[in-house]
UniProtKB/Swiss-Prot annotation:
Keywords: Ribonucleoprotein, Ribosomal protein, RNA-binding, rRNA-binding, tRNA-binding. GO terms for cellular component: small ribosomal subunit. It comes from Clostridium kluyveri (strain ATCC 8527 / DSM 555 / NBRC 12016 / NCIMB 10680 / K1). SUPFAM superfamilies: Ribosomal protein S7. Belongs to the universal ribosomal protein uS7 family. This is Small ribosomal subunit protein uS7. CDD domains: uS7_Bacteria (cd14869).
Amino acid sequence: MARKGHIGKRDVLPDPVYNSKVVTKLINNIMKDGKKGVAQKICYGAFDIIEQKTSKEPMEVFEEAMNNIMPLLEVKARRIGGATYQVPIEVRPERRQTLGIRWLLVASRKRGEKYMRERLAAELMDAANNTGTAVKKREDTHKMAEANKAFAHYRY
């Protein structure tokens, strides 16, 4: 095992169009097989669709959607005396963002629209209105944490 200390997190550069690091992270998560150009077309195409359909600034819709998707609590399995408990824990800001983006894309990919940009746009608009699969995932996670509140004293 290496003993040279912790390696710092690599910082992503803000995207050229909206100057946002979160959009860059979204693009990087959309990307498959290193095809960043395709991922950018999907992301910016989705933002254009949002602008046409809602006549709002796409970044506002995106930020609202992300706030509605990102979880505050999650459960972590902890084994104590032969029993496994689901212990609710708070989610760190970095992980909140990562989970939000991941859930957004999983929900988008499962949708029925023909093109990914349409699916992503629809899921973002749904999430901004507090509906959709990604928001449901967050609600389920929060319900799970609420149901296991009794085990909160087993925190890490």
